[in-house]
C-alpha cells in the first residue's frame, strides 16, 4: 500500500542521485553525476555544509598522483602498494586487498577528474610519508593540499561552510612543521616572517586566506 501511495505522489523535483551528507566525498559524487549529465541533490541535516571534511587538516594522501609527477617526483602503484601493505597490516573488511587496489588505482584518476573541473591542488613537498623508512616509503611525500584561497570570494557561502573553530592562519598545512621550528632553525624564522607579512597584507586588503 505504501508503494502504491509513493508511486502516485506528485513530486516538485526529480533527481537521478540523492546524496546524503555534504562532505568531500559527497561533493565529488555530485560532480561526477553532473559530469555524466545527471541531476544530483545533496541533503545535509546541519546548517553548514562541508561535514567532517571542513574540520580536517585538508591533506590528501594520494600516491602516484599527477600533481607530484609534475613536481618531478616519481611514484608507482607497485611502490605505493608495497608501502601501504607494510604499514597497514590489518586486512579486515575495511582494508581488504580489493579496497586497497581500488584506492591506489583510482586515486590519481580522481585528482585528474577534479582538476579537469576546476579543482586546484598543491603538492605538499617535504610532507613525507609517516613511515618513509618502510618499503615503498616516499621521503618527499605523496600528499596534496589546497592552495591558499580568499574565502571572501564565496560571498554569502562563506558563512555556510563548516570550519574548525579558532584562529585561522593564512598558511598551508605543509608549512606548519617548518613554522614549529621557528626558535631553532633559520627556515622556521623565515617562515614566521612570511606568515607575519601575509597576515599584514591580508589585513590591509581585507582578504580572508584559508587553505
Map each language-model feature to its residues.
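N-terminal Rossmann-like FAD-binding beta1-loop-alpha1 element of flavoenzymes
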Residues: 17-42
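Conserved N-terminal/central alpha/beta ligand/cofactor-binding core
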Residues: 4, 45-211
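Extreme N-terminal leader/targeting segments of oxidoreductases
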Residues: 1-17, 35
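Generic signal for short, ordered secondary-structure residues
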Residues: 12, 32, 92-93
Amino acid at each position: 500500500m505504501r508503494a502504491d501511495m509513493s508511486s502516485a505522489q506528485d513530486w516538485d523535483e526529480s533527481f537521478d542521485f540523492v546524496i546524503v551528507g555534504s562532505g568531500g566525498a559527497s561533493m565529488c559524487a555530485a560532480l561526477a553525476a553532473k559530469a555524466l549529465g545527471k541531476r544530483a541533490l545533496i541533503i545535509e541535516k546541519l546548517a553548514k555544509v562541508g561535514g567532517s571534511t571542513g574540520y580536517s587538516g585538508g591533506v590528501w594522501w594520494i600516491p602516484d598522483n599527477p600533481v607530484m609527477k609534475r613536481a618531478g617526483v616519481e611514484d608507482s602503484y607497485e611502490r605505493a602498494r608495497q608501502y601501504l601493505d607494510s604499514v597497514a597490516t590489518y586486512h579486515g573488511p575495511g582494508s581488504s586487498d580489493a579496497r586497497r587496489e581500488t584506492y591506489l588505482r583510482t586515486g590519481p584518476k580522481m585528482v585528474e577528474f577534479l582538476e579537469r573541473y576546476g579543482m586546484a591542488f598543491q603538492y605538499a613537498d617535504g610532507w613525507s610519508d609517516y613511515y618513509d623508512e618502510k618499503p615503498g616509503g616516499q621521503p618527499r611525500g605523496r600528499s596534496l593540499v589546497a592552495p591558499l584561497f580568499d574565502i571572501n570570494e564565496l560571498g554569502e557561502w562563506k558563512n555556510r561552510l563548516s570550519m574548525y573553530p579558532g584562529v585561522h592562519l593564512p598558511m598551508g598545512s605543509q608549512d606548519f612543521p617548518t613554522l614549529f621550528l621557528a626558535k631553532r632553525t633559520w627556515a622556521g624564522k623565515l617562515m614566521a616572517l612570511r606568515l607575519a607579512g601575509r597576515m599584514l597584507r591580508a589585513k590591509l586588503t581585507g582578504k580572508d586566506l584559508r587553505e
